[in-house]
Amino acid sequence: NYHYVTKIMTDRIKEPFSLVVFDHHTDMQKPMIEGLTSCGDWAGKVIKDNPYICQLILVGPEKKDINAIGLRSNKLITYSAQEIRAEAMESKTNQIDLSVPVYISIDKDVLDESISETNWSQGHMKLGTLEHMLGIIIRNQKVLGIDICGECDTNMPLPEYMEDEEKNGDCLLYTSDAAD
């Protein structure tokens, strides 16, 4: 629920950088209330307002959601869920600027429900795919920071909550190992 904290973190970066966002949603909707940053619009604000952002690389939304983004920018590179499943990402990799460090933000809703439970609609990315992509980034670029968000619904019955928390904990450990 607090993916917009990434904007707060990246606002502190005072050098050119790229932001890599793994998310089932674009987080680039028009703001519902002008001047208020939310989980639905924070990424659009980063690309428009942060003077140090070189690229925002968005990984995981459905193609139809990417097409609905109102913001057009040469700083935005997208990899749809469909491109990832088809392993058709190579055509865009030459657009990625490897000369600047990256900040990585992961919303666990990009992952399949069998791996992680969140309180939003979820994608179908496998943990191995996320680990592979993180490995490529971490091996090739300086990483300024990483954040992970996307928790399960705290209002669900306790047995389901405990099961989902266990899944999420396993996911965090796996992701942490990938970053090492």
Model-derived regions: residue spans:
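Acidic carboxylate-rich catalytic motifs and surrounding loops in phosphoryl-/glycosyl-chemistry enzymes
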Residues: I57-D65, L144-P159
